[in-house]
Curated annotation (Swiss-Prot):
Belongs to the bHLH protein family. Expressed constitutively at low levels in the roots. Also observed in flowers, developing seeds, embryos and vascular bundles. It comes from Oryza sativa subsp. japonica. This is Protein IRON-RELATED TRANSCRIPTION FACTOR 2. The lineage of its organism: Eukaryota, Viridiplantae, Streptophyta, Embryophyta, Tracheophyta. The keyword Transmembrane does not apply. One of its GO terms (molecular function) is DNA-binding transcription factor activity, RNA polymerase II-specific. A motif (Nuclear localization signal) lies at residues 68-75. Transcription activator that binds to the DNA motif 5'-CACGTGG-3' in the promoter of iron (Fe) deficiency-inducible genes as well as of genes involved in iron homeostasis, thus contributing to basal tolerance to iron deficiency, iron uptake from soil and iron transport, particularly during seed maturation and germination. Promotes the accumulation of mugineic acid family phytosiderophores (MAs). Required for ethylene-mediated signaling during iron deficiency responses. Improves growth and yield, especially in calcareous soil with low iron availability. Keywords: Activator, Cytoplasm, DNA-binding, Ethylene signaling pathway, Iron, Nucleus, Stress response, Transcription, Transcription regulation.
Amino acid sequence: MEQLFVDDPAFASSMSSLEADIFSGAGQLPSSPWLDLDLDDDVQDLSMAPTTANAVSSGYGSGGSGSHRKLSHNAYERDRRKQLNELYSSLRALLPDADHTKLSIPTTVSRVLKYIPELQKQVENLERKKKELTTTSTTNCKPGVLGSQLMSEGMAPIVSATCINDMEIMVQVSLLSNVAGSVLPLSKCIKVLENEGLHFISSSTSSGFGNRTFYSIHLQRSEGTINEECPAFCERLEKVVRNKAKL
């Protein structure tokens, strides 16, 4: 058939030279600019594109997660320090009034460790005094005979002085309520102790069993420290208070 068209003069005259070359097979088809494309590589590149985008997105996500963890850690650390400061403030409030000033944490812990044994000793003394009170006869005082029976059994005040530290002393006084009101009121008891070189800090009064009144007086040495003389000094305070109750 190809030969038929080529041999026909009319058909041959109507074709251009390029067309003649194509139909005659003498020439080659013009090369296409797309014939050299590797479609497999293009498909692979397109399939990898989402993976790359996901990797980039994952990178940004990882960075955001790290920043969130850092903020959470900082917030947790702030809360932890706030709780610790509140605990140390509560611990500092348990110290005597003279130590309620702003103290460093090591100083607070040191004073508390020293103060706890002193409180334990004070509790032991109070328990001992309580036992003495429970075994003491508490007969009622009759009018007109208060002075003669004041130092008799059950009538004499029970006094206990305890050193809190080198400067402070706690004095507890237990006596019959009618004696407290007429012979040794709290104001007179404080005055007696101040005459011994002590500075009044605080006090409390309570009523207990056996129609007795209890004084708890917190004092501080005005000058110097108590140190080793504490037992003798406390004994002297106890004697002074008892003697004052005789008046």
